Amino acid sequence: VEGMQDRLDVHGVKGHRDAVIDGMTVDVKSCSSYAFKKFKEGRLREDDPFGYISQLSSYVYAGKDDPLVTNKTQGAFLAVDKQNGHICLDVYDFTEELKDKETEIKNIVKMVEGKLPRKKLDPVPQSKTSDNKKLGMVCSYCEYKQSCWENLRTFIYSYGPEYLVEVNTEPKVPEVFT
């Protein structure tokens, strides 16, 4: 294991790779059992709401001239199931992504430097039996959710917070007031 938390720069975007193991760039992810299944089954390319594939392929790209990285086209996620302690190594070939990485990064920088998007994603039902509406998973992690939803209310459930945008039935759990 080498190159732990080395600072990387891809066309002005900075980050830290977790490690280089046996010459391969590796990113460690702790996750729920649900998310772990995607890593275990190698399905992250099909369902990647947090952009992990882009992140890891960027680390692989940044290592193209690094002598620690001997595998210049592959990267792996070392995924750890937080609930059960299971571990798996999910390896990806990034040959195709690496061809367009410079353009991808420049487009991302341009997007981030621009204005915040005006269109917000539609809320989803809180559950099959509730008439409340909540933020979808991607929006629930966004730091700008308050900007999009002025009347957003946060309720704390045993499994974590839920961000409700429409409350028709008052939840019987604590609410966080900000």
State where each predicted segment sits.
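A short acidic/basic microdomain associated with nuclease active sites
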Residues: 1-12, 18
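A short acidic, glycine-rich active-site loop
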Residues: 42-54
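Metal-dependent nuclease catalytic regions and adjoining charged, substrate-binding loops involved
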Residues: 46-48, 62-178
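Glycine-centered tight beta-turn/hairpin loop motif at sheet-sheet or coil-to-beta transitions
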Residues: 12, 21-23, 84
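Extracellular structured ligand-interaction cores
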Residues: 14-16, 23, 72, 139
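Conserved catalytic cores of phosphodiester-cleaving nucleases, focusing on short active-site segments
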Residues: 17-43, 59
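Short amphipathic alpha-helical face segments that pack within enzyme cores
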Residues: 54-62
